[in-house]
């Protein structure tokens, strides 16, 4: 029995060591995530780099994109091992990838709990195999662009009208709660301007957000529109992120993360709606040219 007692004790020690290792790994990843959020929301260059990376990876949360960037600043297009395999690509030997947080549901004492576990993603540069399906690029005067604009109109929380006399490309009026778009714009300019103003209208939320001002919400609206345009290959000016440090100044890391996460979710909703409008068959199958969680 002494031998069995020793084996049991050894197993208990291994279990304790494994739990301690996992706890330390989670704490280390949590600190890395916090540091990444603080960096992105403090430095204009880092924030713009985040927008470019998030635009290519719409199905990953902002937290996970920033976390992956912190481990490899040069990432572009990331996926899990399983998704890369499904796309006909294999991860190169000796590549460890980047750690991210993956939602995890588990049962304990007969109750369901929601938490997260540590997963890994790999950049396309860490893989080899079949060429990926090229991302869709919206062009002026095409059925795809018409479908995208139609979906944007459906997504607008307020009425959209046109004007041939306005000097701006588009503007949301919080007083009338409507968006006016210049009728002199080409399709791609309409796409960029309308998506930006839809975000303004969404933030105002029919007046339920009483603190709305165009100046305060400009960077958020421009950021979402920029990511959407980048995702669909539509030319758009870079947002003015020079004040990013001031915008987030005084905010705790969790609040900063919440703001960036909310922008990603807004972008993802618009991106997904447009993608499905353009490619209805993707309602029945996973996206092939976009990253998956």
Predicted regions and their residues:
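N-terminal accessory/interface modules of nucleic-acid-binding and processing proteins
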Residues: 1-293
């Amino acid at each position: 029995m002494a031998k069995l007692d020793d084996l049991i004790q050894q197993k208990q020690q291994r279990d304790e060591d494994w739990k301690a290792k996992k706890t330390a790994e989670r704490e280390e990843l949590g600190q890395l995530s916090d540091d990444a959020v603080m960096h992105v929301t403090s430095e204009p260059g880092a924030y713009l780099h985040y927008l470019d990376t998030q635009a290519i990876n719409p199905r990953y949360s902002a937290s996970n994109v920033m976390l992956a960037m912190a481990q490899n600043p040069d990432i572009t297009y990331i996926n899990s091992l399983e998704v890369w395999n499904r796309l006909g690509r294999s991860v190169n030997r000796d590549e460890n990838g980047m750690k991210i947080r993956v939602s995890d549901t588990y049962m304990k004492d007969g109750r369901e709990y929601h938490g997260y576990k540590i997963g890994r993603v790999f950049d396309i540069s860490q893989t080899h195999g079949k060429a990926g399906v090229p991302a869709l690029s919206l062009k002026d005067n095409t059925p795809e662009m018409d479908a995208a604009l139609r979906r944007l109109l459906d997504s607008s929380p307020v009425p959209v009208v046109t004007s041939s006399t306005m000097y701006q490309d588009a503007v949301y009026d919080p007083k009338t709660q409507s968006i006016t778009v210049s009728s002199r714009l080409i399709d791609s300019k309409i796409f960029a301007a309308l998506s930006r103003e839809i975000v303004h209208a969404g933030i105002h939320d029919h007046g339920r957000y009483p603190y709305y001002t165009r100046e305060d919400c400009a960077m958020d609206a421009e950021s979402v529109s920029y990511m959407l345009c980048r995702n669909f290959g539509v030319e758009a000016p870079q947002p003015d992120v020079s004040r990013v440090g001031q915008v987030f100044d005084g905010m705790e890391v969790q609040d900063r993360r919440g703001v960036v996460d909310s922008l990603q979710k807004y972008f993802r909703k618009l991106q997904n709606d447009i993608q499905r409008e353009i490619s209805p068959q993707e309602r029945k199958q996973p996206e092939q040219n976009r990253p998956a969680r």
